[in-house]
From Swiss-Prot:
Polyol dehydrogenase that catalyzes the reversible NAD(+)-dependent oxidation of various sugar alcohols. Is active with xylitol, L-iditol and D-sorbitol (D-glucitol) as substrates, leading to the C2-oxidized products D-xylulose, L-sorbose and D-fructose, respectively. Is a key enzyme in the polyol pathway that interconverts glucose and fructose via sorbitol, which constitutes an important alternate route for glucose metabolism. May play a role in sperm motility by using sorbitol as an alternative energy source for sperm motility. It is a peripheral membrane protein. This is Sorbitol dehydrogenase. It comes from Sus scrofa (Pig). SUPFAM superfamilies: GroES-like. It is an enzyme of class 1 (oxidoreductase). Zn(2+) binds at C44, H69, E70. Belongs to the zinc-containing alcohol dehydrogenase family. GO terms for biological process: flagellated sperm motility. The keyword Transport does not apply. It is found in: Mitochondrion membrane; Cell projection, Cilium, Flagellum.
Length: 97
């Protein structure tokens, strides 16, 4: 019997007031990507807007969306073209920076 693929428990907004905990498969990093083992993830004001209103300004949640985009973790795998991080390095992610 094949081993089950590892999964990541995620907080997903489906629409205004509709939050669900769902498992998502853990992806393999692409050549320029890094896979982090998450230590903490913040839920910020934009996430609250998506949950309460299903939107922020012109951006409307039209399909399920994983919340939380301010995070810290440890690199477990790095893509073949990544030169600035290695497995074991601690990192923080902030997509707006």
């Amino acid at each position: 019997m094949a081993a089950a693929k590892p999964e990541n428990l995620s907080l997903v907004v489906h629409g205004p007031g509709d939050l669900r905990l769902e498992n998502y498969p853990i992806p393999e990093p692409g050549p320029n990507x890094v896979l982090l083992k998450m230590h903490s993830v913040g839920i910020c004001g934009s996430d609250v807007h998506y949950w309460q209103h299903g939107r922020i300004g012109n951006f409307v949640v039209k399909k399920p969306m994983v919340l939380g985009h301010e995070a810290s973790g440890t690199x477990v795998k790095v893509g073949s073209l990544v030169t600035h991080l290695k497995p074991g390095d601690r990192x923080a992610x902030e997509p707006g920076a």
